[in-house]
Amino acid sequence: MATNSPSLWIDALPATFADSNKYTRGHAVVFGGFPQTGAARMAARAAARMGAGLTTIAVSTEALPVYAAALESVMVKSISATNDFEQLIADQRVSAFLIGPGAGVLGSTRSRVLQLLSTGKPTVLDADALTV
């Protein structure tokens, strides 16, 4: 059994260069739920900490103040309308998605999961996204 250490995974991380910018380092989008915000906030922090050049948490308008107050280094974007979601997932600068924490076991969550998976971009399914 191997012990977790940087030697096991360091080669999997992309190289960084002096001319790197936030988009060349990757743009992670976390879809956060409400009122359960903890897991999505932790996921966004983890993405930023592991080296994503830009991390955005996408939430409903009512949840915006909660996330904005808690996440200083993460952008917060409202996706209340269907076209907001569709525009965000179509953005070519976005590298990867995470959906599920606090999303709710809803038809809309299932629809969004299917739309995200159809993009072909790396997508992490967690919590409610695994249930729908």
For each of these PLM feature ranges, what is it?
Residues 1-127, 131-132:
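Small-residue (G/A/S/T)-rich helix-start motifs and N-terminal tracts that mark the onset
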